[in-house]
Amino acid sequence: MISPTHQSQYLNYFVNPVLMTESGDIIDSVTGTTTTTANMSNTTIDAPTPASTTKNYKHKKQNTNTGTSMSPSNSINSTNNNAAAAAATTTTSKKSKDIPLELTAFGTTPSGKPRLFVCQVCTRAFARLEHLRRHERSHTKEKPFSCGVCQRKFSRRDLLLRHAQKLHAGCTDAITRLRRKSIKKSQDGDDDDDDDDDDEEMANSEDENDHDESGNASTKNGKKDKKDPPPEFNLNLFNSKQKPTKANTTKSKVAKLSTTTSRKNSTNPTRKNSSSLHKQVLDQRQKAAVNTKIVSSTKIVSGTNSGVSITPTRSRRGASFSAQSGANYAINIPEFNDIYPQSDNVEFSTPQFLPSSLDNEMTWLNNIPNIPGLSDSVSAANLMRQNSITNSADHVTPPVNVSQHGSFSHQSTFSATDMGQTRSESVNSLNTPFDGSYMMPTVTISNQEIQNGVAAHHHHQQQQQHQQHNHQHQPNQSSLGLSRNDMLSEDHYGYSFYDIPENILNFPMDSISTTSNAMSSGPIQNFKPLSPITQEIEHEITPRIDGRIGDFQNNNNTNDNPIHQNINYDLNFLHTIDDIGQDVISKFMPGGYSFYGDNNVSATSSANDYNSPNNIVSPSQQNNQFALHNQSSHPSGASPHLNQAMMNKMRLHNYSSNKLFTNHIRHMINKALGKYPISGIMTPTIPSNEKLEFYLSVFIQSFLAHLPFIHPSKLNEYEIMAMTGNEDINNESARVCLPLLTATMGALLANNKNDAEHLYEASRRTIHIYLESRKTNSTNDKNYKNGKDKSSSGNPLWLLQSLMLSVLYGLFSDNENNVYIVIRQLNALNSLVKTSIKNKGPIFFSNNGEDEELYNKLNSHDNGTSLFSNNLNDEMRYKNNINMQSQTRIVFIIYRLTNFLLMMYNVPLTFSINDINQLAVTSKDEETLWNFKNYQEFQEFSHKNNKTLDDYLNHKNEPIIFRELLLTVIKFGISDSNISPEIEKKVTHQLQNLCKYGFNCLVHGIYEIKQYQEMKEVDTFKVLDYLTKFYPTNDGLGFNCFRLPANKDLEKIDYALLVDFTKISSIIDLKLLKEQSWLKNYQDLTQNYHRLLDAHSTGNPLNSINDYDYLKLADCCISVLKLILFKVEDSNSNSRNRSKNDPTNEINNKLNNNNNNNNDMNNNNSNGDQLISAFDTDFGYLNMDNNGYAKKEEFSRFTDDELRYDKENTMSYFDKHIKLDIFEEVEKSSNLIQAQMLFHAFSVLSIFSVYVMRKNDNNSSPFANTDLIFELNHRYSMVLRLLERLETFLKLRYQTSAGGGGGGVNNNNNNALSIKLEQEFTNLYLYNGNVLSSDHNTNTNTTNTITTTTTTDNGTKQNQHHSQDFGLEKTLYILKMGENVLNYIYDLNLKVCVFKKLGDSLSEIRKYLIDNESTLNG
């Protein structure tokens, strides 16, 4: 018997409910069609809904407590992960909602009101027309509310308000008027403008009004809600001793506040109660005047200096940003485990904050001008502001009655003291150094105002004390510290990113003590706080280039910084690049996404670690700051006019040219982090200077050696301060962005997870502050378009380098949504680069400071009459060449990064070769200059070898235009193209003079061109092998700027990997696997893998891959594995070590290096490591002629190569020219970029394994080519033996690490590694068995070569008998080993979660093969 409940569900699932509106029309709630009563007789009940729709219903989350139905978007989000099925049933699922009867036209509201307004789409009814109109937008997807900052559109104004609060901190430009309306609690913490729960929001919004009118309202399940009293506005909000109201007490004792509680407050009662505001203000001010005393201590949550205390009557709640419940979030100081930077914290420069109350706080501030006793005159306001600044200049903590958001705070901002105590609090009794983290970061105050206050403090101390004594009896003016006509209103709610300048941050200690004693000797004073954030009147502001608010006109200041003449900011860039931060939501707080793939709390965390390290100034820096302070402390009329550039030159002499992370840089990092405008979140911990220097060295050796776009000579304190010399002296964030990011990448490559995430968070914040200051500067500076130097762009080179590193770090996120966000960040960076290179000038990005002077000097007309000596002039030319190369290299590195995403994960290309235009690539001679650490090292080399700088700066050669060279080289791969000898000679000359990274860019360009359908016929193997002939060899210098040995050529290894991967992609299309492997859509991943198996099966007549292509695939995959996982050295450098200056030695090595691959495998290096051939394919078994062309001319024409070029010997031909020695030793890999090719290599090897298995099953055919089958089985054996060698190595490494020999691995990690060792490697024997175990301990020659010199029938039969063991278990073994290798890289080499994701993708493919074993074998 079916119960009534099940019967009702059955009808809801399989029968379209038919409802009637008040007009008499019948509406099908599933299809949305309307039938009039006249046609009612023709209406029939439709057939049951499809199974897919039924499945969607089963996944619905029914919300019976609130009496509302599930929104269409939620039903869609609850479906299965099959995108195709979900797309087919989206429309049906949206409309097929189970609307409760009480929510239709037949029901009433909880207060008894009839529902008169019916939705014509879903039959939902409402009691008010505006509720229906808002609900209808959930069907029409209309989004009329637009953000004024980032242009995002929203369907409801409350969503826009929440977006403005979360991402733009209530910025004025985001929304013209902030309406105080209740905002839905965010369930997931995102700022999506999706209408997932639009209907539920409407029901709650409607019902809460009914609850206010009726106290007997109940929910659907019969549970009654208590009637909340009408909200009252009172200034006791700012008194932490007040008794909690009933509304707060009711919900404070539960662990999580409900959404309804945060919405039951309405703004209308607040306005009604505003009449009593004046009385409350006067009462509080009188109370403050009577109860004036010093507060000795303040309760701080977990040691934080944010000045926010715990209010026990309020509990922690979710991330809702309702205007009525904003105070609940400003007091929401999380527990340590919540606020600590977890492993899912990778972000890019967007603030996250806890918004203060919009309703209570804003209403109070809006009524301040009406309070009796407050002056409205501008002059009085200016005087009060000046006095307030002067009196508070020596304080070392912020005023407790001003929130960290720059406006007056609510009750949670205060400690357990009353209003009067906080008003009279003085912190002069604390003789501690001023810490920048104590200052409220969003106070709007200019540098000149601070200087005037300091000057007044020194020269008018008697008058100052008198004014303070008078202000004690005038609490209405002094205690509030408000003096502007345009007090904060709804239309001018904003924030500022500027903190107290360093004049106050480094205030002399003796002045502080003196002032403190003077203050304590007199009467107790009321504290004069800094004024809260306001929007200044237009005539009060003067535009200044440093981005700070200008001085009042009535102030006589002659110490203004001169306006820079060479600034040409690109406003489009400012709006575009700042989206990099605005789109990302998660911060150094819970809820972010993980770059590391785990959720463990960092080991270096501390419950008291809520602030920056102490801003301890080094003695030299402290003296400098005292001198600067004394200079600025003179009366403003006596201050000299000093040119900013001249002052920068004077300071440069005090900076180190050998180290980057000095005490001075550390001090600026602390100050920059102290200016971060968001309160309530932890400040990252900066490692010691020694650690930072170590990370810098790792960055140079392991990162710049692969992607050389920053010259190491630029990574010291002197150069950093010089290249940022044009920035405002108080803008510390400009100086510390690039150093922090270099240390971040170094910590990542050093596998220090804690330091990497802390350093990245610090760099993210500093970039955000700098970008905001850039926008402010560009807006305020009216003359920035009148710069004299038109060659300089407004985008500094160091900023492009910093953004590139930041995007690269955050690119491989654990959350696919944030992956898309970071891709948009890269696209914004690409747009900036494309815009910058369109000017066709030599300078794409501005060179500041000395670099700019060098360029101008060397390119001036009177350069011939220079007074510089030749030696000094050569040094200038050398440095200028490094600067010009940096301009070009950053463009090509960003192009390579964008193209890499296309290669690895099929991300659409947004920076093409067509965008590069006529950009010339660096020549080999210029690259030689780049490889020297500095000019002194080049000078030493030139003296020994009788070389001059002109030999390397030979301008007679034509520039190598990258796009033209690429398109010409592609023609060599087209069979019917006729290339003239002149063109071929020109191309040969250019390739002979091309630098290494230029060859790597050419491979990326070839891959891009192959994506076009018209270029599918290009023979990629021919083109790439032709390029390899000209790949530059090391010059035998014996050293390089990357501090690597001469035989460690990482760029050449990258080139070989790119060539192998491009060849693989030209044979088999892996686009179906690439996207899903990154996004972890495992169902689509396995389906696409199945399509690949079917498309390339032996029985498919449409299979475009023949047996020879499969041999090439196997060879390329084996090469990829060896190049990434084994020790690789440059064989050409090894020969040069024996004879550096013998020019004939190079050709002899090229001729003899590959005469016999078997002989190469028997050679040993100095350490006794045995060489293995990375590219040995033993194609000689088929053609017996792989050595016949070895003595050809080295640089012969490509047409001559075609005579001896066939598809059997491509890998040996490539091996002949690349000259890489690969040893049997497995080496720790730090190749962050190219190591991701392992996923593709193992995936292709698994497809190759299935193909060989099926090929062997069909071997009984009389038409089978036994020779090819033998070669296929031979490659298969090579793959399995290589994996067995890796298995032995991984077991040893995991055992060593688990036993405590991993170097600093703690016990928890040891236990985890032991468990992993037991789980991951125990079942490998089941997959692999002992088929090849007898050969496991044989030498390398036997391991890699199982062929004989003769091809007898017995040998073939023996191989066929051996190949019968190559079943599905071997394919599973290949995938399992790929999973283990990727997990090993993640566990012990690079804590980058993309490797773990790729390993999981291989695991899913393996599980799919196990589940479909019968299909594959059949």
Curated annotation (Swiss-Prot):
One of its GO terms (cellular component) is chromatin. Residues 189-211 have a biased composition (Acidic residues). InterPro entries: VerF-like, Znf_C2H2_sf, Znf_C2H2_type. Keywords: Metal-binding, Nucleus, Repeat, Zinc, Zinc-finger. Residues 34-96, 181-285, 403-426, 454-484, 1132-1167, 1338-1362 are annotated as: Disordered. Disruption phenotype: Affects filamentous growth. Residues 34-44, 68-93, 462-477, 1145-1167, 1338-1356 have a biased composition (Low complexity). Residues 236-278 have a biased composition (Polar residues). Induction: Expression is increased in biofilm. Pfam families: zf-C2H2. A zinc finger (C2H2-type) spans 117-139, 145-168. Disulfide bonds: none annotated. GO terms for biological process: cellular response to starvation; ergosterol biosynthetic process; filamentous growth; filamentous growth of a population of unicellular organisms in response to biotic stimulus; filamentous growth of a population of unicellular organisms in response to starvation; regulation of transcription by RNA polymerase II. It is found in: Nucleus. GO terms for molecular function: DNA-binding transcription activator activity; DNA-binding transcription factor activity, RNA polymerase II-specific; RNA polymerase II cis-regulatory region sequence-specific DNA binding; zinc ion binding. Its main location: nucleus. Transcription factor involved in the regulation of hyphal growth. Targets a different set of genes than S.cerevisiae ADR1. This is Transcriptional regulator ADR1. It comes from Candida albicans (strain SC5314 / ATCC MYA-2876) (Yeast).
